[in-house]
Amino acid sequence: MQVDKVINNNLIRSHDEKGQEVLVMGCGIGFKKKPGEYIDDGKVEKVYVLQKEERQHMEELFSSMPLECIQATNEIVEYATISLGKQLSNYLYLNLCDHIHFAIQRSKGGIPIQNALLTEIKRFYNHEYQIGMESLNIIKRKTGVLLPEDEAGFIAMHLVNASMDFQDLAPRQELMKL
């Protein structure tokens, strides 16, 4: 792949072998790179295939995010996809990365947000909640910030919303009644 545009030191816009527009992420992948130069495959950590309508938003979000938040998000989404055994929406990367970034900022600023639905989330979406709890460990390892348990519930709901398998709506409908 060749560089189309350097977004920052860790993010490049390019095209894959199918001609699809992609964002390529990796530590230092964009450092001193210019359009037309080849991307070092050894530095590629993640490739995001872009839909036309999401390109600008993803570029803006990822260019302003610390690399640790992006890496934590990648690891969480990979773990969740395997654990849930289903495909998750690409928008999960955007939404979850943004959420994690602001949760870390709130935590550092001493601004807690209580998850009023935490008990219900544990009950109706226990698997997603357990993934959320593991996500807190991933975030701690990648960023050095331990987020409160309430955030595991918020992450669980991001996973539920990103699920591509909408066959079992009963738990969601039950939660909505509450």
Name each model feature, range by range:
Residues M1-L178:
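A cross-family "folded-core" feature that marks the main globular domain of proteins
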